[in-house]
Amino acid sequence: MAKRRKSSRTKEKETNWQERVIQIRRVSKVVKGGKKLSFRAIVVVGNETGQVGVGVGKAGDVIGAVRKGVADGKKQLIEVPLTKASSIPHLTNGASGGASVIMRPAAPGTGVIAGGAVRTVLELAGVKNILAKQLGSDNPLNNARAAINALETLRTFSEVAKERDVPLEHIYS
């Protein structure tokens, strides 16, 4: 009888993903027999080397909700361009719902100066030096999504030079 090898597709690549739960909330749905309770988890997934995603999971128990949130976060991954100083290349803004976020690059040694969900997103993205401010809503999900939105709009100096058809040295001067 021939031995079957496990497919490499089924085995998930382990590249030290970290996950942090931002919020777990008990939610209810009104049905004919009364209220049906479930849990909603907001999870940030990142590898601290420039990839990060925010996911939301709902299940009857907390562990199931977190597991679904992690899976959703891995589907929503974005690439974040980091500088040599582990900061962002330029100032950026992001918005989601009523929340808006402003991010500014910072000098080495500054640290992550941000609050709440935005701080978690930036730390798991691998940003070490940044100044960020949340404006508007204090909803953790909208703030996390606003942070992701701001990080998505970032461009490297080489991308800008290519778009403008100028040499990279011209951008720095």
Swiss-Prot record:
Protein task: With S4 and S12 plays an important role in translational accuracy.
Residue ranges annotated for the S5 DRBM domain, each copy included: 17-80
Record lineage: Bacteria, Bacillati, Cyanobacteriota, Cyanophyceae, Oscillatoriophycideae
One example of a Gene Ontology biological process annotation: translation
Domain of life: Bacteria
Keyword terms, alphabetized: Ribonucleoprotein, Ribosomal protein, RNA-binding, rRNA-binding
GO cellular component, one term: small ribosomal subunit
Protein name, entry field: Small ribosomal subunit protein uS5
Quaternary structure and interacting proteins, as annotated: Part of the 30S ribosomal subunit. Contacts proteins S4 and S8.
Annotated family: Belongs to the universal ribosomal protein uS5 family.
Keyword RNA-binding: yes
One example GO MF annotation: rRNA binding
InterPro entries: Ribosomal_Su5_D2-typ_SF (IPR020568), Ribosomal_uS5 (IPR000851), Ribosomal_uS5_bac-type (IPR005712), Ribosomal_uS5_C (IPR005324), Ribosomal_uS5_N (IPR013810), Ribosomal_uS5_N_CS (IPR018192), Ribsml_uS5_D2-typ_fold_subgr (IPR014721)
Species in which this protein is naturally found: Gloeothece citriformis (strain PCC 7424)
Note on domains (UniProt): The N-terminal domain interacts with the head of the 30S subunit; the C-terminal domain interacts with the body and contacts protein S4. The interaction surface between S4 and S5 is involved in control of translational fidelity.
